[in-house]
């Protein structure tokens, strides 16, 4: 194995990269509350893994969505566990994200020169909430259906463009198959991709600027 590693290291300088990653200075004021962002990231990875596993069995149609979720819970090996972990990690991600935002705000981590780091964090917070809204509808049960109907109806109060926004969200005048398809696409592709991109930018800026100092 050492010869294989040496072969790759000679060409890619793996050891230099590893040394750079592992030798970053950590200020002495850093405590357990600075781990909240990392826990949020870990929860996101769990979400991706368990969500990907469920896509093999979930059917995003109004006629089969609920039955496919029931199938995952009752017939798929460990399906109940995978879905439960998905739900638990979703709650964990939201809770840790909120605590992380509070920690950053209270310690002044949003101030110059870290404004862009804060902006990417706020965007990811919006994505996190959007995960919850879109995922809530996917079982297409009574709770999910009426939640979607209420949420997508909120923009109707906006003057001039409200009705157009509602139709855009629903894929039509009423809530139906087009709505479920839109929410499924957002939940499984658009939001994960957007979150991953902003996470990368977030981490690179933290890496470049370092952890903010104490108050």
Swiss-Prot record:
Entry's localization field: Plastid, Chloroplast thylakoid membrane
Cofactor note: Binds 2 heme b groups non-covalently with two histidine residues as axial ligands.
Cofactor (UniProt): heme b; heme c
Pfam family for this entry, one: Cytochrome_B
Entry binding sites for heme c: 35
Segments passing through the bilayer: 32-52, 90-110, 116-136, 186-206
GO BP terms, alphabetized: photosynthesis; respiratory electron transport chain
Membrane disposition: Multi-pass membrane protein
GO terms assigned for molecular function: electron transporter, transferring electrons within cytochrome b6/f complex of photosystem II activity; metal ion binding; oxidoreductase activity
The UniProt record lists the keyword Iron: yes
Residue numbers binding heme b 1: 100, 202
Function: Component of the cytochrome b6-f complex, which mediates electron transfer between photosystem II (PSII) and photosystem I (PSI), cyclic electron flow around PSI, and state transitions.
Remarks, miscellaneous: Heme 1 (or BH or b566) is high-potential and absorbs at about 566 nm, and heme 2 (or BL or b562) is low-potential and absorbs at about 562 nm.
SUBUNIT field: The 4 large subunits of the cytochrome b6-f complex are cytochrome b6, subunit IV (17 kDa polypeptide, PetD), cytochrome f and the Rieske protein, while the 4 small subunits are PetG, PetL, PetM and PetN. The complex functions as a dimer.
Sequence similarity: Belongs to the cytochrome b family. PetB subfamily.
Descriptive protein name: Cytochrome b6
Provenance organism: Oltmannsiellopsis viridis (Marine flagellate)
Lineage of the organism: Eukaryota, Viridiplantae, Chlorophyta, Ulvophyceae, Oltmannsiellopsidales
């Amino acid at each position: 194995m050492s010869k294989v590693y040496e072969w790759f290291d000679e060409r890619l300088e793996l050891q230099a990269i590893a040394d750079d990653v592992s030798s970053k200075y950590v200020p002495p004021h850093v405590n357990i509350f600075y781990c909240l962002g990392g826990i949020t990231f870990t929860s996101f990875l769990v979400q991706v893994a368990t969500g990907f596993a469920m896509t093999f069995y979930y059917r995003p149609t109004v006629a089969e969505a609920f039955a496919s979720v029931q199938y995952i819970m009752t017939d798929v090996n460990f399906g109940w566990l995978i879905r439960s972990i998905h739900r638990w990690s979703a709650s964990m991600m939201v809770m840790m994200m909120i605590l992380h935002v509070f920690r950053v705000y209270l310690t002044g981590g949003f101030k110059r020169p870290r404004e862009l780091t804060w902006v990417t964090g706020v965007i990811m917070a919006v994505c996190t909430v959007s995960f919850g809204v879109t995922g809530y509808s996917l079982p297409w049960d009574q709770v999910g259906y009426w939640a979607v109907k209420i949420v997508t109806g909120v923009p109707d109060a906006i003057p001039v463009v409200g009705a157009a926004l509602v139709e855009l969200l629903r894929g039509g005048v009423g809530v139906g198959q087009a709505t479920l398809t839109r929410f499924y696409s957002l939940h499984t592709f658009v939001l994960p991709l957007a979150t991953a991109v902003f996470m990368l930018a977030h981490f690179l800026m933290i890496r470049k600027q370092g952890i903010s100092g104490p108050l």
